[in-house]
Amino acid sequence: MGVPKRRVSKARKNKRRSQWKIAAPKLVSCPHCHQLMIPHRVCKNCGYYDGRQVVNME
């Protein structure tokens, strides 16, 4: 069984948890309007995805 033999110190616990980081979102430019967008998503500015308009932007 996975039972700890000794108490885990604060330093050891914090060293282990130091790897828990949030990554910045990867951004690419939209080929239609050249605004930054998340890849494989519909562009929030123009509504285009994969070379065609899928959302009507007013």
From Swiss-Prot:
InterPro entries: Ribosomal_bL32, Ribosomal_bL32_bact, Ribosomal_zn-bd
Protein keywords: Ribonucleoprotein, Ribosomal protein
Keyword Calcium: no
Protein known as: Large ribosomal subunit protein bL32
PANTHER family, A to Z: 50S RIBOSOMAL PROTEIN L32 (PTHR35534), LARGE RIBOSOMAL SUBUNIT PROTEIN BL32 (PTHR35534:SF1)
Organism for this UniProt entry: Carboxydothermus hydrogenoformans (strain ATCC BAA-161 / DSM 6008 / Z-2901)
GO molecular function per UniProt: structural constituent of ribosome
Leader sequence residues: none
Top-rank taxon: Bacteria
GO CC annotation: large ribosomal subunit
Any one Gene Ontology BP term: translation
Similarity annotation: Belongs to the bacterial ribosomal protein bL32 family.
HAMAP family per record: Ribosomal_bL32
GTP-binding listed as a keyword: no
